[in-house]
Design a protein with these regions (language model features):
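Conserved catalytic core of nucleic-acid polymerases
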Residues: 305, 346-349, 427-544, 553-555, ...
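Conserved "right-hand" nucleotidyltransferase catalytic core of DNA-directed polymerases
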Residues: 2-7, 18-20, 25-27, 106, ...
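Short, contiguous acidic/charged loop-to-helix segments that flank catalytic cores in large enzymes
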Residues: 263, 327-335, 365-367, 389, ...
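Short glycine-rich phosphate-binding loop at a beta-alpha junction
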Residues: 56-64, 391, 452, 550-552
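Active-site-proximal helix-loop-helix substrate-binding element of RNase H-like nuclease domains
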Residues: 21-24, 28-45, 56-162, 173, ...
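Short active-site loop/helix that positions an aromatic residue
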Residues: 64-76, 88-95, 274-282, 393-408, ...
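Polymerase palm active-site segment centered on the conserved acidic dipeptide of motif C
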Residues: 202-233, 471-483, 556-596
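Metal-dependent catalytic core segments for phosphate chemistry
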Residues: 16-22, 396-429, 499
């Protein structure tokens, strides 16, 4: 195996590497020969790359994210077996933030990070600091030393990671998935900037209108000031005694009058002011964020008064504008060449789920949400192509059925596949209707407490406890699963995922949710990998959000590729030895609103 690292000119376009022009040095450590090699001229670099191409494996840190795309662009280099210690680190130590807090003198800015610098501190093999002052304009001797030290840290990190005996199945899956997601990041998601600007104008106008309406609902408050007016015998007011004297009066001709006041207009952006006004109207807060009452759309909807609903509307419109144009990661600010290149951490959550930033496309509102359809219409297909959205059918409940199989011999799975699972859940919990059953089961799966469960039927914590008790009595396998999983966490502080990954779990209360969320994440990662093998036509990945993908292709190939992804989901189930059969569905359209 060969460990390697490269240094190039300064990069600003990390999505497409359009400004990558030159590689100054590549350093490689050959394990078999126990030798470090550094090359800095084009001919020697090409010879080293040829040598590396014959190695059984090459390993580097974040090489799938940068080094390999750079080498492919500059030298056409690829390799069939790549090991990325960044990916390994994120999978094996997904909860490293917790242990970092316990490390003595560990830099705060590196807590929870998986960078080489962070690992240098953890392992005592410090990364060279030259890169912090390098301009990356030309090759320097210090740059070569810096590159070689990165290779040394990577090598030490790799062997440290392997001591944890990570699941080979997990590592294989995560590397393949990360390579596909890198393609997605490079592709970006086509974004209709002109339509976005029109939506921005609509939302801005709506916010002004709502704000005006709220000034009538919430008159300004009168606040007393520390200063007083000065008044003459005729009743004329002066801001200060000095002002009266300057107006021609003698000091004994004015006297101290009433205390000054000022109007404080209601500020709908102030959560404190919102809470004060609502409490004055009789609201009693139930949830707090620190010492302040929690104020959000869900809380305001629960209050349900005309005033609260108007505030809710204002917060919603402001949130949409924040996502669209005003926030630091607003879509219009990040759109380049009418594409948004969102970043994805392929193992950003402890469960193995992806996390998203710059921007967080997972937070684009659903079509059913206010202005959700208008937001999703902004994310489109490239000119001349169609967008295909595919997702797994009933994934959460099928994951539950898989884990229940041990205790119910597939009864819950059979109800999902052949019956009406929501009606079955309704009857088991003793709920009034099917919609309540849907809300109940998903709240239960996401770890909702008794009070939250009780609120589904407009009841109390006691009602929630009663519903769960009935549910457990009618479907005893669920109670057995919950008990077994919570006991496992109490004993081991962890669970084992579908692909053998270790899931660190700090709370037995959230254990079932963690197990099911991880199963769904692993299935969808495997499904994407299988889809890439099954696809018989060209396509471009644009989005991978929880249990759905969005990709574009020629219209005549859309059905074939949509079905290929559904087949990929089924194949993922077989590979992962999933007990409940999996399936998927797809939609074809011009934009994201039409495909999910």
């Amino acid at each position: 195996m060969i460990f390697f690292d490269i240094e190039t000119n300064a990069i600003t376009d990390w999505d497409k590497l359009s400004d990558l022009k030159e590689m100054f040095v590549i350093s490689a450590f050959d394990v078999d020969k126990n030798r470090m090699i550094s090359c800095s001229t084009p001919d020697r670099i090409e010879k080293l790359l040829d040598y590396m191409s014959k190695a059984d494996a090459i390993c580097g840190h974040n090489v799938i994210g940068f080094d390999l795309p750079a080498l492919k662009k500059l030298y056409g280099f690829t390799h069939k077996r790549v090991i990325d210690t960044m990916i390994m680190s994120r999978c094996i130590f997904a909860d490293i933030r917790e242990s970092d807090f316990k490390r003595k003198d560990f830099p705060k800015e590196l807590v929870g990070r998986h960078s080489l610098k962070s690992w240098g501190y953890r392992l005592g093999v410090m990364k060279d600091t030259h890169g912090e002052t390098e301009t990356w304009e030309k090759l320097t001797p210090e740059m070569i030393t810096y590159c070689e030290q990165d290779v040394n840290v990577t090598k030490t990190l790799f062997y440290h990671l392997m001591k944890n005996d990570p699941s080979k199945q997990m590592l294989n899956l995560e590397h393949k998935f990360a390579a596909l997601i890198k393609e997605q990041e490079t592709n970006g998601f086509p974004f209709d900037e002109k339509k976005a600007e029109k939506l921005c104008a609509v939302l801005t106008s709506e916010r002004v209108k709502i704000k005006t309406e709220m000034q009538d609902m919430f008159p300004p408050t009168i606040q007393k000031m520390k200063t007083y007016w000065y008044v003459d015998k005729k009743g004329n007011k002066y801001a200060t005694k000095r002002a009266a004297v300057e107006a021609g009066l003698k000091p004994n001709q004015v006297e101290k009058g009433e205390q000054k006041t000022r109007e404080i207009p209601f500020n709908p952006n102030s959560r404190d002011q919102i809470a004060e006004r609502l409490i004055a109207d009789g609201w009693k807060p139930e949830a707090y964020e620190g010492k302040r009452p929690a104020i959000n759309e869900a809380v305001l909807k629960t209050i349900g008064t005309p005033v609260a609903l108007k505030l809710c509307e204002y917060l919603m419109v402001s949130k949409r504008l924040g996502q669209l144009s005003e926030g630091q990661q607003a879509w219009l600010k990040l759109s380049k060449d009418e594409r948004i290149h969102g970043s994805v951490n392929t193992n950003g959550a402890v469960s193995g789920r992806c996390t998203h930033n710059h921007p967080n496309v997972a937070q684009v509102p659903a079509s059913r949400a206010p202005y959700g359809k208008e937001c999703r219409e902004l994310f489109t297909a490239p000119k001349g192509k169609v967008l295909v959205g595919a997702d797994a059918s009933g994934l959460e409940l099928r994951c539950l059925a898989h884990y229940l199989w041990k205790w119910d011999d597939g009864a819950y799975a059979k109800e999902i596949l052949e019956g009406d699972i929501h009606t079955a859940n309704q009857n088991a919990a003793g709920l009034d209707n099917r919609d309540q059953a849907k809300t109940f089961i998903y709240a239960f799966l996401y770890g909702a407490g008794d009070a939250k469960i009780g609120s589904i039927v407009g009841g109390s914590r006691a009602d929630g406890k009663r519903l769960k008790t009935s549910f457990f009595e009618k479907i005893p396998a669920i109670k057995k699963l919950v008990t077994a999983v919570e006991r496992n966490v109490q004993l081991n502080k962890s669970l084992r995922g579908l692909d053998g990954r270790i899931l660190a779990c700090r709370s037995p209360h959230s254990a079932v949710n963690l197990l099911l969320q991880s199963a769904g994440a692993v299935i969808m990662k495997q499904a994407l990998v299988e889809f890439a093998k099954l696809a018989q036509h060209p396509y471009e990945l644009h989005g991978n959000i929880h249990d759905e993908v969005q990709f574009s292709c020629d219209k005549e190939h859309a059905d074939d590729l949509g079905q290929a992804f559904c087949d990929g989901i089924k194949e993922a189930g077989k590979i992962l030895e999933f007990r409940c059969p999996l399936d998927g569905e797809y939609s074809i359209g011009k934009n994201w609103a039409e495909t999910h």
